């Protein structure tokens, strides 16, 4: 089993939700998160930024609102999940997101006590 964490743009959430469901991965959790990557974005194109303050603003660590999708999949569905998230979210611009894949030892369905891959359906 794999735990997949995907941090994506808010604007891509609905498209990602539909794409994951369309490939048979309808079960996931979504959280609102704040974060930043190494890039500062393209502040020079922002109409509200005073040129006098551009240098100061670009050096400040600003947090951006994103969505974090968490899903647990069987090992044989990891590539499908990752490829679907990439295909849906890749724009080749800074801020497209990040995907982290983590080995998972156990999954337990609380309602029934079932364990293992059967809990992923």
Report the location of each language-model feature.
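Positively charged, small/polar-rich N-terminal and surface patches that mediate targeting and assembly
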Residues: 1-121
């Amino acid at each position: 089993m794999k735990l997949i964490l995907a941090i994506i743009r808010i604007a891509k959430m609905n498209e990602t939700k539909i794409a994951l469901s369309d490939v048979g991965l309808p079960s996931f959790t979504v959280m609102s998160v704040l974060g930043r990557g190494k890039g500062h974005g393209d502040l020079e194109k922002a109409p509200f930024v005073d040129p006098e303050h551009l240098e100061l603003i670009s050096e400040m660590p600003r947090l951006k609102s994103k969505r974090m999708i968490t899903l647990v999949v069987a090992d044989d569905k990891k590539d499908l999940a990752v490829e679907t998230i990439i295909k849906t979210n890749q724009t080749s611009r800074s801020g497209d997101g990040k995907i982290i894949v983590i080995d998972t030892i156990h999954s337990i369905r609380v309602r029934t006590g079932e364990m293992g891959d059967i809990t992923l359906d």
